[in-house]
Amino acid sequence: MLDICLEKRVGTTLAAPKCNSSTVRFQGLAEGTKGTMKMDMEDADMTLWTEAEFEEKCTYIVNDHPWDSGADGGTSVQAEASLPRNLLFKYATNSEEVIGVMSKEYIPKGTRFGPLIGEIYTNDTVPKNANRKYFWRIYSRGELHHFIDGFNEEKSNWMRYVNPAHSPREQNLAACQNGMNIYFYTIKPIPANQELLVWYCRDFAERLHYPYPGELTMMNLTQTQSSLKQPSTEKNELCPKNVPKREYSVKEILKLDSNPSKGKDLYRSNISPLTSEKDLDDFRRRGSPEMPFYPRVVYPIRAPLPEDFLKASLAYGIERPTYITRSPIPSSTTPSPSARSSPDQSLKSSSPHSSPGNTVSPVGPGSQEHRDSYAYLNASYGTEGLGSYPGYAPLPHLPPAFIPSYNAHYPKFLLPPYGMNCNGLSAVSSMNGINNFGLFPRLCPVYSNLLGGGSLPHPMLNPTSLPSSLPSDGARRLLQPEHPREVLVPAPHSAFSFTGAAASMKDKACSPTSGSPTAGTAATAEHVVQPKATSAAMAAPSSDEAMNLIKNKRNMTGYKTLPYPLKKQNGKIKYECNVCAKTFGQLSNLKVHLRVHSGERPFKCQTCNKGFTQLAHLQKHYLVHTGEKPHECQVCHKRFSSTSNLKTHLRLHSGEKPYQCKVCPAKFTQFVHLKLHKRLHTRERPHKCSQCHKNYIHLCSLKVHLKGNCAAAPAPGLPLEDLTRINEEIEKFDISDNADRLEDVEDDISVISVVEKEILAVVRKEKEETGLKVSLQRNMGNGLLSSGCSLYESSDLPLMKLPPSNPLPLVPVKVKQETVEPMDP
């Protein structure tokens, strides 16, 4: 019996368990039903099951171990304490670091673990610097609903430690979404002391646009093994019976070109420029465990995104799915949690700060052994076949043993109709500082030297086989962008499409020297800048046979550094933001403005790590740390750190108020004051007290309210009458111009103390004056009050005093008071 608490069910009937701390008793079923169910489960290929079938047909349910944070004195975290009793952790050598999960005893097929526990984020609430290595996507009605983040060990369970499977042969768990939860199902019996390795089920992989290796490499294992035993003279020469079939690299295939009897057939069978459904079926049939299907390697078996969808998705804020995202295959040499990731590593989650997954390859890129074993990586098809398909990004830390060679088992749809010259690849590599084994993460090769030597690399191709839709007059025009990552030029007739390639490029943070707000954004065909001819192409007139892949549409105006085309107005380019429709006088200002929407702040302060969109703002910010105030007011001799602050200050002396409210006659010296004033009309009060119902326009008002003046938590000894009166004065102050001015004062503590003192002074003086009125009425009668004169002038009213650091002249306010009519005796 298993030393865990299990629930056993058949179909949709669930039998409640009877369990104690050490043993489990299963509710028995009829022997015939039990035998039939066991036979069906053993014979079933669960890699082909849908999520509904997993939920319906699972036999055993393993719950997490109950965990109480206070039971062990806080020595363990939830992720480790929730491990079921039939599992154990796998630790790194001489370390307490968990690097995997193993079975403690035999686990039958059809057992369910879960659900996965973690922090929940929507697409809008994901923290800016969140580590997405443990993100799992939850879908509802085909749309992304939220993420489950298992990064925090204190808020997740043991399932975060399960490593992804390297190949279908090693996979023993399938991840499924049932309802709004993630569960792991055993798809094969797991013996004791075997590591649990998970991959997506078929439905889950479909939603994520991942390949499901079970369909491609495990369906016809018997057929593959039998094909190895078929007698063939040529096969026996290349592959003896006791040796696995040899795999040809592209470099070896190209060398066979000189032998018509072999090379010609290989070209026809493996490197055809067209792809059909028959090719896809052949590929599925020829899959085998000897050549596992790894998600990090690009297999472009899906159609590219339509061009209309691409155009719509280039606007900010519109999410588009990627075809294949980062996979969960860990590096074999780095078994730390940083090398593990949830299988959901989307390219959209890439940010300038999220680079933990980009580790160094375990095999040196310059080693002779690597070049000999994986020569196809330097061949004309190598990097193109692996890295240039739209939306795919093979990572550079993928172990070489997991990268299959190109041979007869990988048919023609994996290769474009013609390759990129090796010199072109070297040029791209040198420009980007990437070695030839880097596989260009999120970067497709640029066809810098499309025709080396002035001829096509394939003897089977001729000018008639090239598309006729593009003219040959631009054949020598080759793309040489400033930043090679910005433009893609894929082969036109293979599965590689220009629109899909453009869609695969993601925004990356630009360096301070680039000045581009969207560095890394691909230019679409509508606004690619017409390239200049290179010297190599000018010297090769016979290259007219090639096509101009980057033909510019002349009716559109735009720039490769912008993700959308620009319009013309009255014959001039209109630099308009496609998000907020704000226009600018020049392109550089528009680029800087786009960083506001993208959140990009490339200029960082080395002291406080604060980010800025412009270098000038960073330079002005440095004065905050140095305390330098080089600009002086000639009227009051007050000094300021920037000319803009001085200019705003001079408006106080001149009385200029350029910002006027459109609803009322109020005018202001600063735009921020007008913005705060508008909240009076819109009743927008963003600062809310968490203990009572009070809302305020200004943050300083809320802080004064929370300083012992909240009715839910009042200061000790404060009468209710005084508390009510103080809150009334806080609300009056909140809607005054003084609150707008104090909002800009840097010393927040002094502002709160000044406001609190003034409000208390008002309340105290009102109480004193009320007592004086009552005393005068009693002792002197009503004659004084009936005269209509006031006991105090407006000058006696307390005015809001600003701290010495920001003296602002205030206009005295005169309060008209009602006269008290004499009472009849």
Swiss-Prot record:
The keyword Transferase appears for this protein: yes
Enzyme Commission identifier(s): 2.1.1.-
Pfam families referenced in this protein's UniProt entry, alphabetically: PRDM2_PR, zf-C2H2
Q: Which residues form a coiled coil?
A: none
Compositional bias, Low complexity, is annotated for: 324-361
C2H2-type zinc finger locations on the chain? 575-597, 603-625, 631-653, 659-681
Family, per entry: Belongs to the class V-like SAM-binding methyltransferase superfamily.
Impact of mutating residue 84 to G/K?
Protein instability caused by increased susceptibility to proteasomal degradation
The condition associated with this protein in its record is: In certain aggressive cases of activated B cell-like diffuse large B-cell lymphoma (ABC-DLBCL), PRDM1 protein instability has been observed. This instability, which impairs B-cell differentiation, is caused by N-terminal misfolding mutations, including those occurring at positions Pro-84 and Ile-107, and results in PRDM1 protein sequestration in the cytoplasm, followed by proteasomal degradation via a heat shock protein 70 HSPA1A-SYNV1/HRD1 pathway. These N-terminal mutations do not affect PRDM1 transcription regulation activity.
Glycyl lysine isopeptide (Lys-Gly) (interchain with G-Cter in SUMO2) crosslink: positions?
Answer: 816
According to its UniProt record, how is this protein modified after translation?
Answer: Sumoylation at Lys-816 by PIAS1 augments transcriptional repressor activity, and is critical for plasma cell differentiation. Can be sumoylated with SUMO1 and SUMO2 by PML. Degradation of the wild-type protein mostly depends upon sumoylation, rather than ubiquitination. Desumoylated by SENP1 and SENP6. Ubiquitinated by the SCF(FBXO11) complex, leading to its degradation by the proteasome.
Q: Which domain of life is it from?
A: Eukaryota
Looking at the record, which segments are called Interaction with PIAS1? 527-574
Protein's name in the database: PR domain zinc finger protein 1
Q: Could you give the subunit structure recorded for this chain?
A: Interacts with PRMT5. Interacts with FBXO10. Interacts with FBXO11. Interacts with multiple nuclear sumoylation E3 ligases, including CBX4, PIAS1, PIAS2, PIAS3, PIAS4, PML and RNF4, but not RANBP2. Interacts with LDB1, SMARCD3 and SMARCC1. Interacts with EEIG1; following TNFSF11/RANKL stimulation in bone marrow-derived macrophages, the interaction promotes the binding of PRDM1/BLIMP1 to the gene promoter of IRF8.
Predominant place of localization = nucleus
Task: Spell out the residue ranges making up region: Disordered.
Answer: 324-369
Keywords of this protein's UniProt record, alphabetized? Adaptive immunity, Cytoplasm, DNA-binding, Immunity, Innate immunity, Isopeptide bond, Metal-binding, Methyltransferase, Nucleus, Repeat, Repressor, S-adenosyl-L-methionine, Transcription, Transcription regulation, Transferase, Ubl conjugation, Zinc, Zinc-finger
Q: Which GO terms describe its molecular function?
A: DNA-binding transcription factor activity; DNA-binding transcription repressor activity, RNA polymerase II-specific; histone methyltransferase binding; methyltransferase activity; promoter-specific chromatin binding; RNA polymerase II cis-regulatory region sequence-specific DNA binding; sequence-specific double-stranded DNA binding; zinc ion binding
Annotated localization: Nucleus; Cytoplasm
